[in-house]
Amino acid sequence: MSKIYGFGNALIDIEIQINEDQLSSIGIPKGGMQHISRDRKDYLLDNYKNSIKSMTPGGSIANSLFAAESFGASTCFSCSLGDDEYGQLFLNSYEDRNKIFFNYSDNPTGVCLVFVSPDGERTMASNLSANNQLSAECISPSLLESCEYLLFDNFSLATDSGNQTVDYCLDTINNEVKVCFGLADSGLIVENLSKIKNLSNTNLHCLSGNKLEHETLDQYTSLNYKKRLVSNGEKGASVNGYQLSAPKVDLINTNGAGDSLIGAFLALEGQMEEEQALKEAINYSSQVCSVNTPRLK
C-alpha cells in the first residue's frame, strides 16, 4: 500500500453550465484557469447563480489523493481553510480526519468556479483566499517523514508561502521519497517559470500534466524526472511516450480527470506493471468525465 503525502489548494468547486457566448464574455481563455478577486468571484456567482449544477470539494491535489485512496493508497492532505461553511463542507468529505492536516485562515475558504461549456470542456476562475496562507505550519512533520510519495503542483508555486512550503517539504523528506510534480495549467507555467526552474535540482519521480502543459514547459525549460505522465483528453494518456487510448464514455465535463489520472497511477504503479497501471488509471479518470463532480463517489 502506497503512502502519499500531498499539499495544495483546498477549494470548493462550483460547476456552472454556460454556452459559448457566455464563456466568451467571462474573458478567460477556454480550457484555461485564471485567479480572480473576491469581488469578481461574488459578481460571477451572482450572475450565474441559476446555472449552478453542483458544489463539491475540489482542488487538484485533493482530487488526486481521493483517486489514489480508491486504489488502496494511504494518503494525507495538507491545506489552509477558512472557518466557514465552505471549509466545513471540505472537511466533511474526509471520513477519517487523520487524513487531513490543516490550519484555519482568517480568510474564507477558497472557491473555484468551473464553467462547463456544451462540449464538456472546463474553464476555471479561482479565488484562492485562505489558500494564500498555506505554509509549513500546515504540514505534519511525522507524516511527511514517513511517506513514500510527495505530491504537489504548480498552483503551490503561485504564492510566497506556497513556495516556502515546497522548500520545507523538499528539505524534510529523505532521499527515498518519490517526488511528484503537476504542471497544473499552461498559463501558470509561464507565470511561475522562475520558480519551476528552481525545481531543476530535484530528481522528480513523476512529472504530470496534459499535452499542452508539457509542450509549454518544453518551450522554456526542462526538469529531471523518471516518469513523464501526459494526459491527452479523449486520446488517452502516455508514460514516457507509451500511449494508451481512453475508453468511450458519455462526456459530461472534464473537471478532475487529469487529477484522477495521476492519483490512480501513483497508487497502482507499485501493484502491477506500468502499462497496466496506466490502463487502469485512464479507465478511472475517463469515468470521472462522465459525472458532474471532480471525484467518483
Question: Positions of the model-derived regions?
Answer:
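Short glycine/serine/threonine-rich phosphate/pyrophosphate-binding segments
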Residues: 59-64, 110-111, 262
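Alpha-helical transmembrane segments within multi-pass membrane transporters and channels
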Residues: 80-82
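Active-site alpha-helical elements of protease catalytic centers
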Residues: 56-78
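Conserved post-catalytic alpha-helical subdomain immediately downstream of the catalytic base
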Residues: 70, 247-297
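Ribokinase/PfkB-type carbohydrate-kinase core domain
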Residues: 1-30, 53-56, 76, 88-104, ...
